[in-house]
Amino acid sequence: QPIWWADDINAWVVSRYDDVRAIMKDAKKFSSKAMGERDHEISLPLLTDDPPKHTQLRAIVNKAFTSKTLKSMELEVKDMVSTMLDRLDPNQPVDISADFTIPLPIAVISKLMGIPFAKKDDFKRWSDALTGTSSANSLEERMPQIMEMATFFQSLIPERRQNPGEDLISKIVAAEVDGRALEDMEIVGFNMLLLIAGNETTTN
């Protein structure tokens, strides 16, 4: 069936390209706002916003993902790859997922966001909790880790306001939508989404 109800995620699943495209282009009938009503109180911008706000929010980070910008990071990413490969013991079995494919995307998105790669284990744990892929299945079990993630990003906001850099978090903190600055919890949700999008999608 091209469209069916999935009990495990409590949602309709659409599998045909033309149907998906039609739904994505019709925000009036198929609003993303319902996504923000399903889980926790932390809204994840872009996932829960429709145009024109969705378009304005995307514009904030689009420049960080242009081919020119990404090309400028190529050597740095290659260095990250080389460093991680050099750490592997050629005489021992390797868990390629744990030792390479998980930490590499986290290293790249950490660089873009200006957050310490040393917290990579926390970033992975938080991402798993927010996406529901952690060992704790219920939202109630995952909520402490989600709130820990939110607290981390909220703690960065004052410093980025006072000393902005070229990182994504600084750009989000300084951004305006419809002439107003984003509220702190909007900034927190935006950063949580970026961290997930920057590592969870790639590692999987």
Short names for language-model regions:
Residues 1-97, 106-124, 128-146, 155:
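Active-site substrate-recognition loop segments, prototypically the cytochrome P450 B′-helix/B-C loop
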Residues 142-150, 154-161, 188:
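Metal-assisted phosphate- and nucleotidyl-transfer catalytic regions
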Residues 120-125, 162-172:
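Short, charged hinge/linker segments at domain and secondary-structure junctions
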Residues 93-94, 168, 177:
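Acidic interhelical loop/turn segments
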Residues 161, 165, 177-180:
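Hydrophobic/basic alpha-helical segments enriched in Actinobacteria
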Residues 126-129, 171-175, 190:
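Short acidic/histidine-centered micro-motifs embedded in hydrophobic/aromatic stretches
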Residues 102, 106, 149, 176-204:
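Central I-helix of cytochrome P450 enzymes
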